[in-house]
């Protein structure tokens, strides 16, 4: 759930970077409950049952008792608890400085992977312990990362411990080689946030300057959504950072585009951050003058044109910053939106009647927004020459927009403006919206019959389908050429249940799937604990193979043993084995069919876990089902129990249950892999389960994306896909009396989507056959 919330918040750039608990605080509150009743204050504090006396005394800063224990048992100093914490971690978390000093003197291990004691001190802002560890030269490697890929430097910056951040930087700069130091400076976390970006988000200009000037931080570093430090500064209205970053990064940084197709000034416009917009314009003027050696009014027009190329640029949706300023429906301060518009027009030279990709002006946008917010902006735009008679691509003016959105005050204001300006525009307020493509006349003709209009629309739709098909095949050939020539070196495949359907494992959500066949079942601890028989019966029915009579050489070797890998599985393996371009296969499947094709395990990440591993939820004993004991027990209708004599609880597969986070491998690898990806292939997944579904947007905006699936989904969907889906649904209901998600249509659809995507819609294996046939045809 946390990962889903983070992905939802990307657009607003509310970065959830603060650790969800301070490590020291967590121990106190987990192990020492609040005492609200007087009698409880006399009770001894509670600690984890696993904690030895050494851990307890270390936590409580009991120097003499700790010394006594480690003198008797020297090896106990490096013992760890279930969190992999040593007595040093525990002492640091509670700021037990005397015990920390003692343990450091006794050569306790300081480089335990993930959170080191140094990480904890940096996170908690404990300057004394940081200084003590530095003075004693007992500091771990600066590039040791936490579970979320955070360095100690990153954690100190995240929590605004500037003095500690300075000391950490200074220490490692003198003790590391330059390459290792640079690696630490630019190390991003699992969300792609670097120390520089975090310093911007924390509005710490001193740290920004120190990272860049002393650490040579990469000013072009970007988050998971491709937002740079300048994007972030624009969003939080950090004008001092904007000025400084632009001085260094220049126009190249200003033109950087994030996942949403926005430059930094687009983001400032969305927020109505007029101060940031003003700073952008002022700094850009200085940069343009400097770059073009302009020294007078003779170059003023050139300067303005160069400026407009940057501040009037359209985003992915065809909107300029001015349009975005006017889309103020969610604005908390409409005055800021008005000031932003004034800055863009009066100081940036943006045209008041400039149009977006839909031929709409800023006034069109305002006419759609509730008049309680947009009325002051409408008055301003009319006062400086905005034309309310310009028609958008549907033939509507701002007057039509206001009328049909029931913004009566704006509607009347626009009508009054027509009278005042003696406009000759002939207003037909009942005019219907009619899409006017670039190939048709912009003038509307009321004499056109409805039949001819319908015919034109139909032929236009057919033309679009044919164009999309031709463009899709052309793009597919380009992808194939790229694979043949070795141009694609880091291909990522996202695969789902659809690629295993032809192996006899139906996707969960179809009429033959696991969820439909057993309404009581869910992948949840609640079902496993309360109804283990229901849980394992569903697992047995869905995953355990129906083994037919076979010869002596065949053997039931566990899950899906009688099920063979599909053409889609072998296609993924070919990317690795034949073409050497597979970087990683991220799969939602918990079956081992991909491994059976010969794909190396290090090339596969099971995002939702795998049935290869099992464990006991009580004693935590791990099981690898090499001997097939677990599946044989499930296959005969029994329950798999823990083999520990004192435990004997029902064990569970190492798959992700509802509400559980995805694996550490998934979180760490995705951020690094998707930055390298040069081709993304999506196969057999509905892209509705997050955070897996969000991965499709994590490749760079110029990376081709190829979808093999029964139907278009996620960002690949267009309006024609919706029409096809509705038509197929009606057809299936007419034939069987019920709706189905199964693919009864043998026809493959190959089409282009957007400016980079290709879809091959239909059965995944047939899509692979088509790909391979085309591959071998030239």
UniProtKB/Swiss-Prot annotation:
Composition skew (Low complexity), residue ranges: 733-746
Keyword Signal: no
Region: Disordered, residue numbers: 438-458, 727-746
Top EC class of this enzyme: transferase
EC number: 2.3.1.286
Cystine crosslinks: none
Positions annotated as active site in the UniProt record: 608
Protein name, per record: NAD-dependent deacetylase sir2B
